[in-house]
Amino acid sequence: MKKAVQAKFIKTAILNKDYPIIRSPSGDILPEVAVVGRSNVGKSSLLNHLFEAKHLVKTSATPGKTQALNFFSLNDQIAFADLPGYGYAKVPPSVRKEWGPMVRSYLESRESLKLILFLLDIRRIPNEEDIQFLEWVLYHEKALILVLTKIDKVNQKELRLNTTKILDTLSLMNLHHLYYSVPKNRGRKELMIMIQDALNDEDKQE
């Protein structure tokens, strides 16, 4: 019998001092996975699919409007931080400016952060914001998995061509990546394995 998935919403926070310390029942601090991507890339849908919950992660009616981090736990084993989406054109400039310092503060100071899931829409070539973020992650030597979302929107030829274009644009042909589609129910098992493997590798390095 398949073991039931237990996902829980923990907290919404804006300031570093308000970020929760998420622990296992035995008191150990859980390794944390940050989920990052442009607005409309499908972060909420992917997390709900990953958690096997329809509405645990709320989808904003106005993408990019709320500049806050949402924290979750999965099976009391892994913590997840859903970072606000970036790049939404209709967001006021003042709100857009908040994204950089907030996310940078989280990524630089969060000791429990062990892995970043970087989501990109398979139909979109990475722009300057995407490349800058990836360069920052690599500079700080953070573990990262590239998740190419919305693959149900392209055919097999487009999938191959777009993957090559994306990896070429990022100048990282050997970057760990996988395909994800919520409507096709594709990618969850593979992503969970990659997450666990990455967290195990982090444990060995510490």
Swiss-Prot record:
Binding residues annotated for GTP, in chain numbering: 37-44, 64-68, 82-85, 149-152, 180-182
Keywords: Cell cycle, Cell division, GTP-binding, Magnesium, Metal-binding, Nucleotide-binding, Septation
GO MF terms, alphabetically ordered: GTP binding; metal ion binding
Necessary cofactors: Mg(2+)
Domain EngB-type G: 29-201
Family designation: Belongs to the TRAFAC class TrmE-Era-EngA-EngB-Septin-like GTPase superfamily. EngB GTPase family.
Protein name: Probable GTP-binding protein EngB
Species name: Protochlamydia amoebophila (strain UWE25)
Encoding gene (name): engB
